[in-house]
């Protein structure tokens, strides 16, 4: 099923559905504390074990050169059932709904694409990658820069950037995406950084509100 321009949202009648949705991770699909309190400490605590077990491999030698060991430590953690990605309870249902409507969903995060795939590949609600059409990281640009969102729009083949809905918890990212022409909503989850009092973006506390 293809979502066509002008198609109405049958659930709430609010107007046309987006062709694509681009999601941030921390504070949007996933609690900020998961990254800060689980992923980062796990990588810190297991770097020695990882290097001892894999030091002779070409991958680890490349990792050391390119400073990307962290993602591979996490990969081992997921494979060994020591890590499990965490998403908010409203996320799986929304992803399934958007997928059924033919809306393509992408992730844009400062974390590497490997780290993104790991989080969504093994979550507290199972493997959610089947609902995701692609992943963007900072190779496309800084998330607070307008050009990054222009690059994403061009990469997705979307001629009208406002056909893309971007969800983030970071005000500066919302400003950049809006300046690039995207539709924007801000995720206002528990524990997220407070927004400026004079901000004018639509805010949501759950994907069920979209």
Which residues are covered by each model-predicted region?
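Substrate-recognition element of Asp-dependent hydrolases with the DxDx(T/V) motif
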Residues: 70, 82-123
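Histidine/lysine/aspartate-rich catalytic loop segments that bind and position anionic ligands
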Residues: 109-143
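Asp-based phosphoryl-transfer active-site loop
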Residues: 15-37
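Short, well-ordered beta-to-alpha junction loops that form the rim of enzyme active sites
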Residues: 25, 108-112, 169
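Short catalytic/ligand-binding loop motif for oxyanion handling, primarily in non-cytosolic enzymes
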Residues: 29-33, 114-117, 174-175, 193-195
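Conserved phosphoryl-transfer catalytic core
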Residues: 35-72
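Asp-based, Mg2+/Mn2+-dependent phosphohydrolase catalytic module
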Residues: 2-16, 130-210
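Short, basic/glycine-rich phosphate-binding loops at helix/coil junctions
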Residues: 70-78, 130
């Amino acid at each position: 099923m293809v979502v066509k321009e002008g198609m109405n949202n049958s659930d709430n009648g609010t107007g046309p559905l987006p062709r694509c949705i681009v999601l941030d991770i921390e504070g949007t699909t996933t609690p900020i504390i998961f990254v800060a309190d689980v992923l980062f400490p796990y990588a810190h605590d297991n770097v020695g074990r990882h290097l001892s077990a894999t030091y002779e491999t070409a991958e680890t030698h490349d990792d050391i050169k390119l400073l990307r060991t962290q993602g591979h430590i996490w990969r081992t953690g997921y494979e060994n059932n020591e890590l499990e990605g965490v998403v908010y309870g409203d996320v799986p249902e929304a992803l399934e709904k958007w997928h059924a409507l033919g809306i393509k969903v992408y992730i844009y995060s400062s974390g590497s694409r490997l780290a993104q795939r790991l989080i969504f590949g093994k979550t507290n609600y199972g493997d959610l990658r089947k609902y995701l059409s692609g992943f963007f990281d900072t190779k496309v640009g800084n998330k607070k820069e307008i050009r990054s969102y222009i690059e994403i729009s061009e990469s997705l083949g979307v001629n009208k950037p406002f056909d893309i809905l971007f969800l983030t918890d970071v005000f500066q990212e919302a400003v950049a995406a809006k300046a690039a022409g995207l539709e924007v909503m801000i995720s206002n989850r528990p524990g997220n950084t407070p927004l400026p009092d004079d901000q004018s973006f639509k805010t949501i506390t759950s994907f069920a509100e979209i």
